[in-house]
Amino acid sequence: MTAEKREAKVVLVDIEGTTTSISFVHQVLFPHAKENVEKYLKEYWENEETKQIVEDLQQVPQYADYQATLSAPPAVVDVKVIAGFVRYLIDKDLKVTPMKTLQGLIWACGYASGELKGHVYEDVPDAFRAWQKAGLRIAVYSSGSVDAQKLIFGYSVAGNLLPYLSDHFDTHVGHKQEQQSYVNISNSLREKPQNILFLTDIPGEASAALSAGLQTIILHRPGNGPLSDDQKSNYEVIPDFKSLYSLQLPQK
């Protein structure tokens, strides 16, 4: 089935490499979090939300790996220790839920101050408008926290796009290359899997969604990773959302 002829009730979009350039995430957002994590922790160290994040960070398996990189085990878990661990996770692009939550809080300060603006491709607002007009729901599934998702779309270069979005999912629903995550999303949306179209740039995510019964299309935007010949033949691949402007609800 070609993109132009597809029907769906829900469009489920990934962010990085799909609605938003990978370079924005890796060259703007991640460095901003790295540069500001220590400042943020110092300011909000006694905040209950921060305390919970710090506790959760110490429970993840990667914390032991990080400690092994230190010259000596820290005598106390302080701002510098946790900030160092967060920078370690960012450098290794490890998608750890409490770290993602902390990143979202740091970015919130950056967006509120006007230092950050969420990047979206030019075709994204047009697609959102077309899908909403056609009666489709639009949901987001990203490894970034729900709060971080809302910041990108709420403070985007195209203005506030949140009114177009009905639902947000992050790693609390499961990891993106696991079939069960998409089953959980379908259940949460109260929609049959075959009525959900998932748009992503990662073949492993497309495979997991497909195995759960969702429709899938891979976005191959500028700067995205290369696709093998097998991946190009196994999945529908499109360069942008323009061929999906005409997406409609299933005909009864």
Swiss-Prot record:
The keyword Amino-acid biosynthesis belongs to this UniProt entry's keyword annotation: yes
Family matches, as Pfam families: Hydrolase
NCBIfam families found in the cross-reference section: enolase-ppase
Alphabetical UniProt keywords: Amino-acid biosynthesis, Cytoplasm, Hydrolase, Magnesium, Metal-binding, Methionine biosynthesis, Nucleus
Assigned GO CC terms: cytoplasm; nucleus
Binding sites annotated in the UniProt record for Mg(2+): 14, 16, 201
Cofactor(s) needed: Mg(2+)
Protein's name in the database: Enolase-phosphatase E1
EC number: 3.1.3.77
Gene source species: Drosophila ananassae (Fruit fly)
GO biological processes: L-methionine salvage from methylthioadenosine
